[in-house]
Amino acid sequence: MSPLRLLNPQSVPVDGTDSHLPAIDPAALTATALRQRFAHPPLWTPEFEGDGRFIAERTAAQAAVLVPLVQREDRGDGGLHVLLTRRTEHLRDHAGQISFPGGRSEPHDAGPAATALREAHEEVGLATAQVQVIGLLPTYTTITHFVVTPVVALVEPMDVSALSLDRFEVAEAFEVPLSWLMTPAHHRRHLFEAEGVRRQFLSMPWQGVGSAGQAREFFIWGATAAMLRNLYRFLRA
C-alpha cells in the first residue's frame, strides 16, 4: 500500500480552517450563473491536482466523476444541492469514503462526460434525461492511480431515498447544500507526514441524513474534498 494512503483520516489533527476566505456569493450559485460561468470560464489555477502524480507504481487509468447539482429551488439554502455517495466498506479502492458517482473510463465512452453519465446511472440510477452537463473541471490524479475528470452537471429534482443504488458499490446517497460546501469556513486542513514530507488534505464534515434515513456525520475528505475546493477556486477566480 502506498505510504500516502490514510487508513483513519479522522484521526489526523486539524491544523485549522479557511474561515479567512470569503464564501461564494449565493447569486453565483444559481443554475443560470453556473451555466454562464462554465460557458465563459475565467483564467484560474486549481489548488489541488492530486498526490497520485508523484507515484509511479503503475500507469494511471482515465476516469470521470459526475458532480451532480440537484436543483432544489423550494429550499432556503441557495437552491442547488450536491449529490454524494458513501462507498461500501468492502471495495478495494476508497472503501467507505464519500465520493461523487463515477468510475473508470471504458473504451466505448465518447469522453469524460459519457463516462460520468454512465457511471452515475449504474451507481445511483440517474437517467441521462435528468442530467444537463454544464462543464468540466481540471483532472485530479488519485493515489489509486486514476486521472479523474470532474463533470459538473445540473440534475432535475428527485427523491434521494428513491434512487436505485448499486448496493455492491454504494452504501447510501445524500445531499449537501452547494452554498455550504462553497463556504471555506467549513473547509478543515489536516497535516501529516509521509516519506519525510509534510502533506495536507482537506475535510468538510457534514451532519446530515442519508438515503437510509439515518442522521450521521459524513466525513467528506481526500479527492472529493479537493475537487470541491477546486470548484470553489473556479467560482472565486
How does the language model describe each region?
Residues 165-203, 207, 214-216:
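NUDIX/MutT-family hydrolases
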Residues 161-163:
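Acidic/polar loop patches that form or flank catalytic/metal-binding clefts of enzymes
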